[in-house]
Every structure is written in C-alpha cells, then in structure tokens.
Amino acid sequence: MSFVFNEAEFKKESEEFYSTYPADVSEIENELNQRYEKEKVSAMVQKKWTYEAIAQKCKVKVFRYCPFYSEVITGRDRNSVAGAFPPIPGLGCWALRTHYPVKEFDDWRKPYVERDLLFAEMMTDHSHHYADVERVLYDGFEKIRKEVSEMKAESTEEQEFKDSMLAACDALIALGYKFSEEADRMLQTEKDDSVREQLIRIRDTAGRVPRLPAKTFYEALTSVWFTRELCTAMEGSGFAVMGHYDRILYPYYRKDIEEQRITKEEAQNLIDCMMLITEARWKHNENTSGTNASVVIGGCDREGNIIYNEVTEMILNSFEKYEVSSPKLQVRISSKHPDKYKKHVALIAKLGRNCLSILNDDVLIEAHHRAGKKIEDCRMYLAGGCQEPVLSNECNSRAFMYLNLPLLLDAMLFPKELDFWSKENLRISRVDTAQNFEQFYESVVYNTAQFLAMCAVHYYRFEQIWSEINPMPLYSATMKSCIEKKTEITKGGAVYNSTSFSLIGIGTFIDSLYAIKKTVFEDRKYTLEHLKEMIKADFQGFEADRQYLMNKLPKYGQPDAGVDKLAKQVFHDLAKHSSGMPNPRGGYYEASLFAFYFYDVVKENTWATPDGRHAGQRISRGCNPSETSENIDAATLMNSLRSIDMAEYPGCGVTYLEMPVSQTDTDVTLFEYVLSAFVHCGGSALDFNVVDKDKLIKAKENPDQYRNLVVRVCGYSAPFISLSEELQDEVIQRALRNG
C-alpha cells in the first residue's frame, strides 16, 4: 500500500476542520458536572469519568489526506497541541477546571508577579512532558492493561489509581475501534482511489494499533503519534516531546525495506506528513508562543552507540523542504557524530529553518549523570518545548517559574523600596556594609540562595496540590515504574522526578556585579551610595556615567579575563544554590538557564541596573550576554562558554545565536564551524535565529509577501508576521546589532 503526500489538500482539509474549533461539548461536560455535584469524588475518579465519557460520547475525525489518526473531538482549542494551562476548553481539562484557581498559590505569587521579580503562572509544569510512547510501541495498550489489572491495590487510593489506569487503557483501545469504524463509514461514499487506499489502511490498522505492538514503519509512526496526541487531549496537560524518532523508528523502517513492504520514497512521504501535522493545526495569529511540540533526532542509544541513520536523514529532509515553525527539531549532537550529520544540520540552520535547537550530548549526558542518574538512562534523554531536557523514565517540572536575577540584585541594593524580603521573614545579608567585593558578593550569593530556598519550600506544597487537582493516570500507565510502584506520576511514580526554577537575566546580572566590583571596590570611581542614586534616578542627570558603565567597562561575552573569572563563579554559585532542594515527588531541584520570552515580559518593572541599563529595557536571555553588549559575534559568544561548566545545569543552559546573514550568500561551512565550536567549547543548548535583516524590515512593511518567514524568538519559533510590533522590532534590532 503506497502513500503520496498531497500537502496542499492536507492543509486545506485541516484548515477547514480546525477553523471550527473549539467544538461544543457542553452537554457532556454538564453531565459530568451534575455527577460530580452529587458524588464529590476525588480528582482521580474524575479522570476515570473523563476517559469513559470521551471514549463513549466523543466523535473522531479521520482526514482524507492524512494516513494518521488521532483527532478526538473533546472540545479542546485548536491551539492546544502541547499545552493546557490555564485550563483550556475541552473535556481533558474538566477535572482541573473544577479545582481552579488555587487561592493559596495565587495569593503567594501575586506580589512577586506584579513587580516582575517572578514569572509564575503555574504551580508546576503543565507543558513539557513525555509519555513513554516507546513502551506503547513495543507492548501496546492491551499488554499495559494486563499489567495494570495484575497490580495489587492495598488502599482506596491505590484502587482508584488502578481503576483510572484501566479506564484510560480501555478508552484508547475503544477510540482505536472508533477510528476504524469511521474510516469504514467514509469508504461507503469515497470515490477517489488514492483516498480510498488510505481509508482502507486506517480501517485495517486502527483497531489493532496501538492496542497491540506496532509491526511496520507506518504502524510505528501511528502508534507514537496517537499516544502522544491522546495524552494531550485527555490529560489536561501538555506533552511537548513527540519522541526520539530516528532511534525508535529505524528498526521498523529497516525491516520494511528488507521485506519490500515500503520504499524509501513512501517512507519520506509519511515522515513529511507527520512533520506537518502540528503546523496544519496551529493558528499563529491567535498565539505566537509556538506549539511546544518537538521531535528529537541524533544522540545515542542506552549503550552509547551513535544514532544517525536513514530516518534521521528523512526527518532532516522534511525540515529542509518545508518552512515551518512546528514541530521544533531538537538535534542531539556530540563530538562523535559523523560530519555528514553535522553538515546536514548546518544546512537546515543556513536555510533559516528557525525551529532548530542543538543539544550537546557531551555536556547534557554528563549533567544528568552528575545529578545521580544511571548513565544508560542519561543517554536516553529527550527534550521538548523550548529545549527542556527530560529522561524517558522521568517526570520533570521545568519552565513554570522564572526568577528575574537583575531585579533580585536591585532588591538587595534597595531592600526597603523593593521589599521582597519581609513578606517571608527573610533576614538578608546587607550588601551596603561590605568592605570589599568579596564580602559584597558573598552577601549577594547568600541572599539569592535564601530566596531560592524560600521559593522551593512554597513550591513543595504547590507541587503536592498537583495530584489533588489533576492526576494523570493515562500518562502514568505509559510509565512502567508507576505500575510497579503503585504510584501515580504526579506523586513520584516515575524513576526520576526533577524540578527546576529558570533563572533569567544572568548576563545582565554578571555585568552589574562586575560594574560594582570595578567602579566601587577596585577603582573607587563611585561610592555604592552614589551608584545607587544613579540607579534610582534611572541615570537621569547621569548620562555620562551611564555611558561609562555601558561602554567603557568590559562585559560578559567579551574577551576579558576579569569578567570571565567572575562569570565562571556566578554560573557555579547559581547552579549550586538552585539545585538539591527536595520536591514532594521524591526528587530534587536541578539548575537551568532558559528564558522563553519572559526576559521581555519582566522588563517593565525591572529597575535600572548597575551596568548602565535603563529601567524598562530588556534583560539578557538564557546564557547570553546583555542585549546591549557590543562586538559579540558567534566566535566570541562560543568562546565565552569555555570557562563555564555547563554540566552543572541538567535543566540546560541555552545560548541564543543571531546569524544576520543572507541565506543565499553564506557558505554552509560557517554553520558547521559554529556547531563544532559550540560542542568543543562546552555549550549546553543552542538556538539559531538565522535572519536577513533587510528581509525582516520588508516583512514588517509587507506582511502578506512573507507569510512563511519563520524566526526564533527565544525558545519558541513563530512566523515573523504573527508577532506583535514590539517583538518584531526586537528581532530586527537583534539582527541589526549583530550584523
């Protein structure tokens, strides 16, 4: 059975269908509400009811021009490919909505969020999860159900968990049959032979896969996609990680080729269609922050064998062919990968396919191993969303709380005006009594550690609420350890259970500390009180001093031994004090440095900083230097990573690289050099944003002519014309500054 991907018809069909979303499921939801009002059961039982209602009462959609099936009409938003918080419409979030908002959490976070010290919308991460699709691929839900049925429940809680997992397995099996029946119904009237061929394939497959293990390349793709999509639709959470596709799919492809069941051309068509599903669903002008959906390629297997095969090449071919912002391509790379792989990845970057993240295996595997995880498990890491790493047997909570480091430093300089301390009865170490920079820095580190520890104490309780308002038994069923431990995923059922606070503005933070070190304690150019006076005035009346601070002092990212030494110390101390605190799932905090777009969001209330930055200006992104730093090109940016041990950051530290060059004139060798330098210099994660500054300016003036121009904003990708005018200007300014 062959398949030729008709991109135009698929996109047209998808747009016609998804433009009607969200579907009205109020009748089903009202029935659930009435039942809940009468019985007031636990959230776990609510999820069981949800699965049963979806399986029994929701319709399914089979697309004529797509061979994959997964669309269950649960009432969720069109733009809900990998996120579900705040609770979105649809039955998957019904249980969560009945318990939302959580006053305890909202009351605590409000003063910090209002002043932009924290960006904290969620009690825990609702977007960056990985259901173990590989287990479903090999075992199927029928076998998983059997394992659940053999679980010996010894309490009411365990029995409810068991019953809900059984209901989840039953629901997915029943929905598979529904897709088979719908395809058969459509066959009664379908006249197009090529469409009929795909409907027959769906009819004959959906009742078996993923109920049973996949046997072919097509079935493997279908099983992986179906599982991930149904988890997103039914769990009220986001499953950003689609899977490590080239590693898990290659054995099926090789077997099909050997048995002449498939041609390479048809396999490429199937991959092309799969890579365009999330893009076809998403409507960018409604939400520019991207889908989060991510495909992982490269890397290695459990034994450390390098992954690079024909499926890797086919996935790269798709990204070479199509200008999409989704899914994101998470490229695992190391010093051991072949040059052919690096060259193809470099070509994707050169073409401006700005949905690309590079993950350095040499650093990230070591980072997770240092965190106490088995080396064979560390080798199996994935990533999703922006770049958030997660092991295949791990439930992490990342990218849910962001700490504004520059504003925290200002709060130490102005503890009365920016009082983030008394609310928590924190006794801070006064920085204004320091006799030298060493004492000043010790106070800064102590206060930062106190604040992080305080946040971890509060979030210990907030993470406990997770299981009370939105347990995830379907997700749990895909994790073998949850069944073995008889523990639901949000309570610690995974093998590894990590949490991370995201620290933003580290470049601005380092530059500010260095400015204090140099001008106050070494050169005695200013007293600390005078510097504070300038900061409080936003440098009004002190422009000459601001220019000195901005342009005469070396900055992080520029080649300077003094700044490099301080940067190394700051990175180390922040990693140390944002790691190791316990979470309620039996795991610990891990250090991370990524920004999403919150480096921009928090600027409004971030005071001026000692490096000469004006109040209201953006702070630095990820591991990057300050946005105002000059003369920092790709080479100096890579070199700045040499002195920093990024393996102290299991949650990864992201370097964002603007390459303002014409996509037609630049040799791909430049991008190969950047990739090699990034790995050699010990970077953790790298985001490319390859843009033509002239094209950006033209796109802003004539948006209809540049609908396919995709840019990397910061962790997420989006069509340039979908961005707000302010963000468009910011992307243009980055290109101009680095050009």
Place the predicted regions along the sequence by residue.
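A conserved hydrophobic secondary-structure block that centers on an alpha-helix together
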Residues: 187-194
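Extended, non-transmembrane alpha-helical coiled-coils
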Residues: 174, 178-181, 185
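Extended non-globular scaffold/tether segments
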Residues: 163-174
